[in-house]
Amino acid sequence: MLNSNTKDHEDLRIYQIIDANLDRAREGLRVLEDWARFGLGKEKYVEKIKNFRQILGKNHLEVYKQSRNQIEDNCKGLTHQEQLNRKTSEQIISSNSARVQEALRVIEEFSRLHNNELSKIASEIRYEIYTVEIDLLSFSKFKKSEKILKENDLYVITDQKDNLLEIIEEILIAGVKIIQHRFKTGTDQDHLQEAIEIKNLCKRYNSLFIVNDRLDIALASNADGIHLGQDDLDLKTTRKLFGYSKIIGISANNAIDISNALDEGCDYIGIGPVFETTTKKNKKPLGIENIKTLTKDLNIPWFAIGGIKSNNISYLKRNGFKKVALVSELMNSEDPKEDAMMILKELSHEN
């Protein structure tokens, strides 16, 4: 409750400070709430943020509102250049989270003088917003990666090449948006350095960088995702360690593999081999009809893999296959940029 231990003029100044910062905090919360609702579809966070906003609204007393017009504010309308430089949803989330946190800190400090209840409320919400900010940023990053995954039909897997970085850049220039890196020979230090270099290339071209199998390398290189085989670390543990802003894909060869992958919450599935392939010599080809049966009810992205070449993509397309993963076709190409462009064109062609 309010008390009258301070002088009237000082009270007015303090009320004005609290009023301005309650407005700032509530406005910033509204921005976060709307992004959680319309941008991310996260009902849990919408309810949580709305509750914070309503609590502050309930404590926005009339005495605070009345103070705003009683002392002239010569700094009204001041802006900063950084406010004009926000170009992404992440920047908007970060700036408005900071706006809320800073406003709540001011409220917490000044309301201690006469309204301990409001000070406590501001402190509790401020600490909650630190976590909300991190979660919203993670969800937003995942949303972008998920969008790339859904909208792009060519998934390129690397092979060991002396000029690997050159090949990767050529296919990225061509328009490839998903790269999975497989490790073969070399030390872990070599693998990490190579992963970081490929990650930087993918970032430059707004493409996803996915690491095959190695969670440690994926974490250390800040990869966008990881692809797991049936004998790798389980998805639940991987998700816990890797985080919810990252893409996790699973290899599948049968209905049980697919069912388990869906139950565990994977983001995409690689299904195959479709045809005979030198990269999976011990795997019997599934064939077109078998894969069509396996995938008829799949509602997440899936990529056909195994023995896929530029000369059989049109055949796959005619059979309803939309997304494919390639290895040797581009890794062994004499002109990876041109071949990647041709394959992308073929995949975009409506049969």
UniProtKB/Swiss-Prot annotation:
One GO location term (cellular component): cytoplasm
Protein function: Condenses 4-methyl-5-(beta-hydroxyethyl)thiazole monophosphate (THZ-P) and 2-methyl-4-amino-5-hydroxymethyl pyrimidine pyrophosphate (HMP-PP) to form thiamine monophosphate (TMP).
The keyword Methyltransferase belongs to this UniProt entry's keyword annotation: no
EC number(s) stated in the UniProt entry for this protein: 2.5.1.3
Region (Thiamine-phosphate synthase): 129-351
Database matches in InterPro entries: Aldolase_TIM (IPR013785), ThiamineP_synth_sf (IPR036206), ThiamineP_synth_TenI (IPR022998), ThiD2 (IPR041397), TMP_synthase (IPR034291), TMP_synthase_cyanobac_bac (IPR016229)
Name of the protein: Thiamine-phosphate synthase
Binding site for Mg(2+): 213, 232
GO biological process, one term: thiamine diphosphate biosynthetic process
Cofactor: Mg(2+)
Pathway entry: Cofactor biosynthesis; thiamine diphosphate biosynthesis; thiamine phosphate from 4-amino-2-methyl-5-diphosphomethylpyrimidine and 4-methyl-5-(2-phosphoethyl)-thiazole: step 1/1
Record text on cofactor binding: Binds 1 Mg(2+) ion per subunit.
Catalytic reaction list: 2-[(2R,5Z)-2-carboxy-4-methylthiazol-5(2H)-ylidene]ethyl phosphate + 4-amino-2-methyl-5-(diphosphooxymethyl)pyrimidine + 2 H(+) = thiamine phosphate + CO2 + diphosphate; 2-(2-carboxy-4-methylthiazol-5-yl)ethyl phosphate + 4-amino-2-methyl-5-(diphosphooxymethyl)pyrimidine + 2 H(+) = thiamine phosphate + CO2 + diphosphate; 4-methyl-5-(2-phosphooxyethyl)-thiazole + 4-amino-2-methyl-5-(diphosphooxymethyl)pyrimidine + H(+) = thiamine phosphate + diphosphate
Entry similarity comment: Belongs to the thiamine-phosphate synthase family.
Organism classification: Bacteria, Bacillati, Cyanobacteriota, Cyanophyceae, Synechococcales
